[in-house]
Amino acid sequence: MRKLIVFIPLAILSLSVSAAADRANNAAPPENTESFVTSVESEIYYAPLDKRALPQERFVGFTPAHMVARVSLIAPTANDIKQARIDNERVAKRGIAAGGDAESAVPRDERAQQIGLPAYMSETATRGLAPNALTWLPDGLGGAVARFDVTSADAKAIRLGFNVGNIPRGATVRFVGDAENDRIFAVAGADIAGTEDGEYWSPIVLGDTISVEIQLRSARDRNALELEVFGASHLFANPAQNDNDLLKATKAGSQSCEVNIACSSDSAAKAVAAAVMRLVFTKGGSSFLCTGTLLNDTATATTRPFIYSANHCISTSTVANTLQTFWNYQSSTCGGTTSGPSTTLAGGAFLRVTDFNSDITLMEMKQPPPSGALFAGWNAGAVANNTGIVGIHHPAGDIKKISLGTMTNNAAPGFSGKTGTYYQVVWNSGVTEGGSSGSAIFTKSTSGSYQLRGGLLGGSSFCNAQSSPDIYSRMDLKFNLLQPFLAP
């Protein structure tokens, strides 16, 4: 028996949950004989609340304005941004042609919601930001600091890409945006140097200018520093909370039939929604949105922060390293259109499992999830036809929504070149969109909590065609890949 302590505001509840092996004899056998496993599962777990104040980060050095290196990037053109928005809009309107019906629905290939495009460095700018070209000043602690600013004109937010060689021990790099100068991200040099392929992407900061401060433990270390800015991702939509510009990634945001999670009368669905987060990541300088779900595991000694999402969102360690997560991005009221207080975590993730044909990706965050986050349960058995389904997601990058439907069949996706077998789901409330990709479908366990069963590949659902199916990955068919991490 695994004893889990659930921490929630204003109350402390003790939740006793059976581990996978204890529950195996009571689990109903799956109807689909393709499953590799029959009854392995996990229940929910809440991360403890931590009321300690986080340290206030700040730039440690004072660099006079005339000593700050400043460069401007070659930003994407207005036409480039317009085309990206058109592409997003095309995904949003994928379901039914004007005047068409459900039978005319065109399947939506898998597609993350794009919110950023590459911005490029000139050779002159690259040379100007080389460590030996910066002005280094004493930091008052025996070390040295240098600062530089990079601008991509009219960006709503920005992140820098670095080629990483040697980072001296004890180095710290700090990042801040000009539109939110009280939010400073401090990254240990060891974390930057630890990327597998020598490519590092900074945290996303708000505004069109990012300021970078490099602090070295010894002034002599500047001769050993190998850190080169090679470009940036210019975000044309702001991924931060309470910002309606994100909705302009498409012309109108998510579709009109989407339902805020706050509208749900299902307390178990509202609870598991705390495991669902918005994912922002960067591929080749372009930035995208998908949805992910924090998963529990059956190990008693540790609770590792695994995220279940989609292979078509993140399929390489390089991209997983760019991951930035947005938690509790949801309205507190049924009719709300903006998020309440939310939490942003940078730092990337380790890629643990990814599989093209099943469209499954499992990552492990490089830092703990925020205080009070929920680790969702999961069930690796097959889902029977006509089972009720709940989907929780961020359509078009919008605040968290809930969709209700039914698993109707097992199917090949019919698009995207993938050959796996998937769950087919039709909705009676809500639908999915670009940005929903990777989001989970859940079924209720015998305890009454929700368990993850798969993640969104794509589909053809639309507000005017809720009966047009969406396609979800099947955890049961690839649990042999997931088991070493989720049920070691």
Regions found by a protein language model. Give the residues of each.
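Positively charged n-region of N-terminal signal peptides that target proteins for export
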Residues: M1-L4
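Bacterial N-terminal signal peptides
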Residues: F7-S16
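Extended extracellular/luminal ectodomain segments enriched in beta-structured repeat modules
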Residues: G143, S152-R159
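Non-cytosolic beta-sheet module surface loops
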Residues: V150-S152, F162-N166, K283
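Short, surface-exposed beta-strand/strand-loop-strand elements in extracellular ectodomains
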Residues: N166-D182
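Catalytic nucleophile loop of clan PA
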Residues: T293-L294, A299-R304, G430-L456
